[in-house]
Amino acid sequence: MTKYIVQGGHPLFGEVEISGAKNAAVAIIPAALLVDGVCRIENIPQISDVTLSLKILEHLGAGIRVINRHTVEIDASRIRSTRTSYELARKMRASYYLIGSLLGRFGQAEVAMPGGCNFGVRPIDQHVKGFTALGAKVMVEGGFINASTETGRLKGANIYLDVVSVGATMNIMMAAVRAEGNTVIENAAKEPHIVDLANFLNSMGANIRGAGTDTIKIQGVDRLRGGSYAIIPDQIEAGTYMAAVAATGGQILVKNIIPKHMDCITAKLVEMGVEVEEREDTLLVRRSGPLQKANVKTMPYPGFPTDMQPQITTVLCLAEGTSLVTESVWNNRYRYVDEFRRMGAHIQVDGKVAVIEGVPALTGAPVHACDLRAGAALVIAALAAKGESEISCVQYIERGYEDIVTKLQGLGASIRTVEVPGESEELEAHIG
């Protein structure tokens, strides 16, 4: 098992390059199955979820050619199966995007029940509602989600999502892109990676309008051609480094970003006393004075992202006064709080609300990551804390952060990896 050893208490200085967006990549890679030709995908992040996604496609019969560290070519012209590997697909939540892509192209899909981060029930009822409206029959049998059509092709429909769901919006979009006729998705999610998926599909010949609004209109096409596409920068990775310098103090230049995507995060950090200077594709982030209390509520985009909730909570642990964090997107996303308490944080949780009494400093401690974003938050806490911290279960962090140790070292952080023999790193299906 790999662990991180962090000597905290050092401010961060320097530049950090942001990788391609994880949440876009894990949808765009399955979407390549909808294309009859070869897709060249650039700016792919080097993270374990991407590696797993490519392995799943390869198991289905897709040709995978690695051009360089951040570019792959996917040839889905010779797919030999619509049934995913149980052992591979169960390890990640995003494997459910294979239902939409396989169903959209072949009219059938058998996908193992997905895993992912264990911070609440991850229902796929809105996905199923959309697939059913498009003419599919969906059942769960033997640990697999089986979806099929009688005619082999879906038919366009009007679909209203009962709740704003990023996953359902993207999955239905993929299923509908090659359906017969027109599809309208109402109450759609608006996240940047939804727009990125739509742009990818449109670049391959799809006809999708309205991505980024609450109504998406899709005119089905018979086929998609091959082409090249570059994934957008990762909003959450950028926000994580911004939160890190907010917690430790210092000044960093966050490079390769889309500033508009960062507005919801930037606004809250500025409220807390962090200075942020926006440039064309960079943000200069500086924190020299004391942190101020703030109230944060997670919301669908363009609101404050749930994937940044643990990281902003870390910063608020060091702010003067009492702060409130309300988690309105997922249940049980405060599982990391006990680990923070080991480091001296004062946090009380009542349902969806965390009450945070700021402390002058955190202290190093042995802690373990319980999911991807909580793990990143623990890294931030360890960087800001006095003394040494040991973070275990870091494989969850590496699901979504490319070269996090190297990037932090480049900012002056004292962080290193150590290998502990005899301990398993296997990700359980329900944990991320």
Predicted regions and their residues:
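Short, structured segments at the rim of ligand-binding sites
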Residues: 1-432
